[in-house]
């Protein structure tokens, strides 16, 4: 029999030590991975609740198990809040991740072998947009578009040319490392020209969209997916949204369950509901506006210090920095910055001469540092420290100085006060 007073401490101290070390790392490092953020303690409370015990295959009011009357209310709250937040008619809150949400969209609306047109992973797209190593590139005939090498921007004329040539059943708009604003009306026009469905993966910018600071794809897309973490600051999970379309809604629901998943994670759905409520608060827009201001401030410093920011700057929360001119690799930069308490991720740049395990760039995002409370002044300072490390790669004295500066900034701006 379990006790309500059971604790990990004293029972599994080996595991607890690793958990505590990770929490300490989050407090003592400046997190600049664009896809990472910190959740509120409310979100964590929901994920650690008794809802983790409940199986609830099916949908509210149509479950395959009894005893679902309370979790039905939880899921309906999450659905209603998601619809309100994004102005959608339909929301499915059950996908376990963004990738599983994307897989469900393909399963719902495509047949194996159908052609999809998505952004190349090498140019800032995502694995699930047709990369050959992904199921999206194995099950479907994936054609890829990319950036204009001269401007660093999506070449919409090339997207249209590829669409006319290959006649895709679905066009995928979305990215994992693109710092400019997507032209959803142009994507819609291209899709209509060739009779394709338009699928938008807004995982990286969902928080900006919710705040009204980035164009909302809902009016233009046939279906939209997102993660619920990243800029939304919720639990790790997925979400599918759409305008009213009974046929598509039915296909999407069936693709998620029973097509791709079994029982939903009700404790995570509760945490999603909390996250959506937080995002509906007036202060959420202020937070997202600061995310963008911080990103722009950092990009200005990098450009001023002679670093190439792909696409020439940023309109959102992230930037991709090419290190080709400096003769550095992303792997080297990632490791050096990690030694001083700054966490980034190595990332391929367009036409990258290095392998995906080495790369010639780093991706930087501001959602997490903005959650800590950093503003433009601290963001510029931080960008300068990054340049100092990269300008003097491997210099122990520079690393020691920056590590001290990072520790001071972390102490001044704790994640949880």
Swiss-Prot record:
List every position bearing N6-(pyridoxal phosphate)lysine: 230
| Any one GO cellular component localisation term in the record | cytoplasm
Catalytic activity entry: (6R)-5,10-methylene-5,6,7,8-tetrahydrofolate + glycine + H2O = (6S)-5,6,7,8-tetrahydrofolate + L-serine
Where found? Answer: Cytoplasm
* Top enzyme category: transferase
Query: Where is this chain primarily localised?
Result: cytoplasm
The organism sits in which domain of life?
Bacteria
EC numbers listed for it are 2.1.2.1
The residues the record assigns to binding (6S)-5,6,7,8-tetrahydrofolate are: 121, 125-127, 355-357
Q: Which GO terms describe its biological process?
A: glycine biosynthetic process from serine; tetrahydrofolate interconversion; tetrahydrofolate metabolic process
What CDD domains has UniProt attached to this entry? SHMT
Where in the chain is the site Plays an important role in substrate specificity? 229
Which family does the entry's similarity section mention?
Belongs to the SHMT family.
- NCBIfam families to which the protein is assigned, alphabetical: PRK00011.1
Q: How does it assemble?
A: Homodimer.
Q: What protein is this chain from?
A: Serine hydroxymethyltransferase 1
- Species source reads Pseudomonas aeruginosa (strain ATCC 15692 / DSM 22644 / CIP 104116 / JCM 14847 / LMG 12228 / 1C / PRS 101 / PAO1)
Task: Print the organism lineage.
Answer: Bacteria, Pseudomonadati, Pseudomonadota, Gammaproteobacteria, Pseudomonadales
The gene that this protein is the product of is: glyA1
């Amino acid at each position: 029999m379990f006790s309500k007073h059971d604790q990990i401490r004293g029972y599994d101290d080996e595991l607890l030590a690793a958990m505590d070390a990770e929490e300490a790392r989050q407090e003592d490092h400046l997190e600049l991975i664009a896809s990472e953020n910190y959740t509120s303690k409310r979100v964590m409370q929901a994920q650690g609740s008794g809802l983790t015990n409940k199986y609830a295959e099916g949908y509210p009011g149509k479950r395959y198990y009894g005893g679902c009357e309370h979790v039905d209310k939880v899921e309906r709250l999450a659905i209603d809040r998601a619809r309100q937040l994004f102005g959608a008619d339909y929301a499915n809150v059950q996908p376990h991740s963004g990738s599983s949400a994307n897989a469900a969209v393909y399963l719902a609306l495509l047949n194996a072998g159908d052609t999809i047109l998505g952004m190349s992973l090498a140019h800032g797209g995502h694995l699930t947009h047709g990369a050959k190593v992904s199921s999206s590139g194995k099950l479907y005939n994936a054609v890829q578009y990319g950036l204009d090498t001269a401007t660093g921007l999506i070449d919409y004329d090339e997207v249209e040319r590829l669409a006319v040539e290959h006649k895709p059943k679905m066009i995928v708009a979305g990215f994992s490392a693109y710092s400019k604003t997507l032209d959803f009306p142009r994507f819609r026009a291209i899709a209509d020209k060739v009779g394709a469905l338009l699928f938008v993966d807004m995982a990286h910018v969902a928080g900006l969209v919710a705040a009204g600071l980035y164009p909302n794809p809902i009016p233009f897309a046939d279906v939209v997916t997102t993660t619920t973490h990243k800029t939304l600051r919720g639990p790790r999970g997925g979400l599918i949204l759409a305008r009213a379309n009974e046929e598509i809604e039915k296909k999407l629901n069936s693709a998620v369950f029973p097509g791709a998943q079994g029982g939903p994670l009700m404790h995570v759905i509760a945490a999603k509901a909390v996250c959506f409520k937080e995002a509906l608060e007036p202060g959420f827009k202020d937070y997202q506006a600061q995310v963008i201001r911080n990103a722009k401030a950092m990009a200005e410093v990098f450009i001023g210090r002679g670093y190439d920011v792909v696409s020439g700057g940023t309109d959102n929360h992230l930037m991709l920095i090419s290190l080709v001119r400096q003769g550095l690799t992303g792997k080297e930069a990632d490791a050096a910055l990690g030694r001083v308490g700054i966490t980034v991720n190595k990332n391929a740049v367009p036409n990258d001469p290095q392998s995906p395990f080495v790369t010639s760039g780093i991706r930087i995002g501001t959602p997490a540092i903005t959650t800590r409370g950093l503003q433009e002044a601290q963001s510029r300072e931080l960008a300068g420290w990054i340049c100092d490390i990269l300008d003097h790669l491997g210099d122990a004295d520079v690393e020691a100085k920056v590590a001290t500066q990072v520790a001071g900034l972390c102490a001044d701006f704790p994640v949880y006060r």
